[in-house]
């Protein structure tokens, strides 16, 4: 993940981003918390699905932790209004 992606991830807590893992898996997620500290920098997130009307709904009731090293990139989702602090 680039420094710009990491910066966006940190600013997007409580917002939904597109996430791509180094394995190639892609999904939408609500970013809960980013912990960019040793020994295991990671992000806590909740996977979400986009409904036909554009709304997002949780795809699970439990969140998950993903190591920052396992994230290839993050991006804002087209058509979603982000507040200024969460924009790239």
Regions of interest found by a model, annotated:
Residues 1-88:
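Conserved RNA-binding domains used in RNP assembly and mRNA/RNA metabolism
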């Amino acid at each position: 993940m680039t420094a710009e992606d990491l910066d966006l991830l940190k600013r997007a807590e409580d917002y939904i981003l597109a996430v791509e893992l180094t394995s190639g898996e892609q999904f939408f997620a609500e970013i809960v918390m980013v912990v960019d500290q040793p020994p295991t920098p990671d992000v806590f997130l909740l996977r979400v699905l986009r409904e036909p009307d554009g709304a997002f709904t949780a795809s699970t009731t439990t969140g998950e932790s993903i190591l920052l090293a396992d994230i290839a990139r993050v991006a804002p989702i087209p058509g979603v209004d982000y507040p200024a602090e969460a924009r790239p």
